[in-house]
Amino acid sequence: IKHAAIADVLENEIKTGDIYIKDGRFEKIAEHIDAGEIEEKERLTVINGEGLTALPGLIDAHTHVELSMLSSASFAEALIQNGTTAAVLDPHDAVNVLGHKGAKYLMEEMKETELTPVWMASPCVPSAPGYEDCYGQVMLSDVKVMVEEYGMYGIAEAMDYNRVIAKEASLKEILDYGKEKGLKIDGHAPGVLGADLDTYIAAGVSSDHESVTVEEMLEKFRKGMYVIIRRGSLKEPASAKEFLDKAGDSDHILLSTDGCITAKDMAEHGHMNYALAQIVEEGVEPLQAIK
């Protein structure tokens, strides 16, 4: 690809240059690449990148396949087509119906796609005990299967935050296991602040995507959490620009859809590229948004 604008999120600048891709991987990125240096010239295809901007692969920091109403394969294809190359996935709804076997089903189908999935083991099934029907309660034994047999990366959102704060035995056992194994533990704690937030974080939770005000986002950020800005098909109440202006540039600020983007919107507007466009429209600098 010749003469493309290349978004460099490490140095926070747009550079003009060439990109050489071989066998589906970036072989070289430079201000100028001489075609004479390239082996197998007979296979070389040159694309004029003038007027185009090359971005790094986008990552959805937290999402759910099931909310899209698509199969794992179709979901992954939609993401790849829109520049999302990796996603942190919580198979909560599949586990809600079929237990850990539901998660395995989603994982197996996605293996045949180009998306890089980061699967997290769902700890809070049911999410609201006593108010919903499901396959049964997820216990430590289920989480161990998902992590140790299925190869999941961490513990998905601890969405029953009341049980976390109350240190309810079965959920505490799961979170303690995650801490002992050094696993990432995602959060889900709308409106949880002050001493309750301290207890929630001490349980091992390291992220949150459910804040409803900038002040809530800032408190979680200042207490060391990864704060995930959510964008998609929903109208979100907290301003991304105001939060970023107050928090500053940080690797502890992420962007996700949380699965809250319809298949129709993905087809018409995109996926993480749509989420990026939304926060840029709010006033966030494009390079900061991409990072």
Where do the model's predicted regions map?
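Glycine-enriched alpha-helix->loop->beta-strand junction motifs that scaffold or abut catalytic
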Residues: 84-85, 151-152, 199-207, 221-228, ...
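Divalent metal-coordination and catalytic microenvironments
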Residues: 4, 24, 51, 62, ...
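Divalent-metal coordination cores built from histidine and acidic residues
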Residues: 76-184
